[in-house]
Swiss-Prot record:
InterPro entries: Epimerase_deHydtase (IPR001509), NAD(P)-bd_dom_sf (IPR036291), NAD(P)_epim/dehydratase (IPR051225)
Localisation: Mitochondrion
Protein name, entry field: Inactive L-threonine 3-dehydrogenase, mitochondrial
Family: Belongs to the NAD(P)-dependent epimerase/dehydratase family.
Keywords: Mitochondrion, Transit peptide
Tissues expressing this chain: Expressed in all tissues examined. Detected in most cell types examined, but not observed in endothelial cells, glioma cell lines and some leukemia cell lines.
GO cellular component: mitochondrial inner membrane
Primary localization class, coarse: mitochondrion
Pfam families: Epimerase
Length: 230
């Protein structure tokens, strides 16, 4: 599909401090519009008037800057807005629009979407496993309440929404090699639990709002520093 292929190439674009995928991965994507199965990112035609307006939450994590670099090459620097609660390094700040965004502040999220005419939303904000286990209440808030805010604003404003899952959504009792799409998951971390919740919420949004979910699960082993790539 268009966005899955686009995301695979995003990771292939070397960027300072970014990581590059070396294995295929899957995302939870939610869209109120169907995309043709044979759509291709590079063959798709976008005029100046129908360029997507993109917001990336949690953009200072492992994936955001690399994705932004790809999207900005395709749609223009000003069409892609990075957001986070941390101060960006100089090279990120000067590369294109960056704003402060706390996903727990629903009113602020709505204002950002409306004021910037956002049409695509990549939701990367999350507390990962180790930090989440040490801060369970904060992980619940960011990974679950924050997700609900993102889902609500996406439904309200008819956005294309993309949320990554994780290999951590599976547990020790999950079947392996290969792991089927539908199987026992039973994760052992709050991060994994929150991602299972996100996957199930995607299915719920599909049934309630005719959105279209896909799932992507990846692990840290899926990624390696861009400097190590040929």
């Amino acid at each position: 599909m268009l966005f899955i292929r686009m995301l695979r190439r995003a990771g292939q674009s070397p960027a300072c401090g970014c990581w590059t995928p070396v294995l295929p991965v899957r995302f939870l994507g939610i869209s109120p519009r169907q995309i043709p199965a044979d759509a291709n990112f590079h063959s798709a035609s976008f005029s100046d008037t129908d360029h997507p307006r993109v917001l990336i939450t949690g953009a200072l994590g492992q994936l955001g800057v690399g994705l932004a670099n790809l999207l900005r090459k395709r749609f223009g620097k000003d069409s892609v807005i990075l957001s986070d609660i941390r101060k960006p390094p100089d090279h990120v700040f000067h590369s294109g629009p960056f704003i402060y965004s706390d996903i727990l502040d629903y009113k602020n999220l709505r204002e950002i979407v409306v004021n910037n005419r956002i049409t695509w939303l990549f939701h990367y904000s999350a507390l990962l496993s180790a930090f989440g286990e040490a801060n369970v209440s904060l992980a619940r808030a960011v990974n679950i309440t924050g997700l609900h805010n993102i889902l609500d604003v996406a439904a309200e404003h008819n956005l294309q929404l993309f949320v990554p899952s994780t290999i951590g959504a599976f547990g020790p009792t999950s079947p392996r090699n290969p792991t089927p799409d539908l199987c026992i998951q039973r994760p052992r971390t709050i991060y994994g639990v929150s991602k299972v919740h996100a996957e199930l919420m995607g299915e719920t949004m599909q049934s309630r709002f005719s959105m279209m979910p896909q799932s992507m699960a990846n692990s840290s082993a899926t990624w390696k520093p861009a400097r190590d790539c040929p």
